[in-house]
């Protein structure tokens, strides 16, 4: 922007939040076969990002920032924060009950995300305190159960959990590309004057949690 900002406080916040109960994303698939010769297979896939086509997938981008070449004068706090927090739980179950049965269960969940917070531009900053923080805390769970109850039994399963994340907090630089997480402008020299005891906090934190659970069972005659 090109206008001078004079305010008591400033908050810039961008977030993806989990619901108070349950998962943000979930998917389930169940297959069963009870014929004399039974074959059943189930597959569940979930992609969390900007494109559902994995071959052409792009990051989910959550971004909070200020880009100003003019002065920013705030009596109190300047808080700029970006947070990604979601859960994804998918389940694939295949059960086969024929005398000669084969079943496979495939469960795959992937996430690509960027959490970015920045204070850019060349304008001076005067504030009581300054906080620029980016964080991410996704949790992915993939579950697969495959079973067969025939005399000649075969069953297989696959679980895949994958997170590709970038978390960045910057002062003096701004992001320049939605497709390249490493593409940021050259840093500007900024004059920052902080008058309060809270000072300046610049933080980037990421906690990626993944779990895969698989069970295969078969029974004889």
Sequence positions of predicted segments:
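Low-complexity, glycine- and small/polar-enriched segments
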Residues: 1-221
């Amino acid at each position: 922007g090109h206008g001078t900002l004079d305010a008591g406080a400033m908050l810039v916040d961008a977030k993806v939040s989990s619901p108070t109960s349950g998962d943000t994303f979930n998917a389930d698939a169940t297959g069963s076969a009870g014929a004399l010769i039974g074959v059943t297979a189930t597959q569940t896939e979930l992609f969390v990002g900007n494109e559902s086509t994995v071959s052409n997938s792009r990051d989910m981008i959550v971004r909070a920032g200020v880009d100003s070449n003019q002065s920013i004068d705030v009596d109190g706090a300047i808080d700029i924060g970006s947070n990604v927090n979601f859960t994804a739980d998918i389940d694939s179950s295949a059960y086969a009950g024929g005398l000669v049965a084969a079943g496979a269960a495939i469960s795959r969940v992937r996430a690509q995300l960027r959490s970015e917070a920045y204070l850019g531009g060349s304008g001076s900053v005067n504030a009581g305190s300054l906080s620029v923080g980016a964080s991410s805390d996704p949790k992915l769970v993939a579950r697969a159960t495959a079973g067969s109850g025939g005399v000649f039994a075969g069953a297989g399963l696959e679980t895949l959990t994958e997170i590709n994340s970038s978390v960045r907090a910057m002062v003096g630089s701004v992001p320049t590309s939605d497709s390249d997480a490493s593409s940021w402008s050259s840093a500007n020299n900024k004059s920052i004057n902080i008058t309060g005891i809270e000072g300046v906090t610049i933080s980037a934190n990421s906690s990626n949690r993944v779990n895969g659970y698989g069970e295969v069972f078969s029974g004889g005659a």
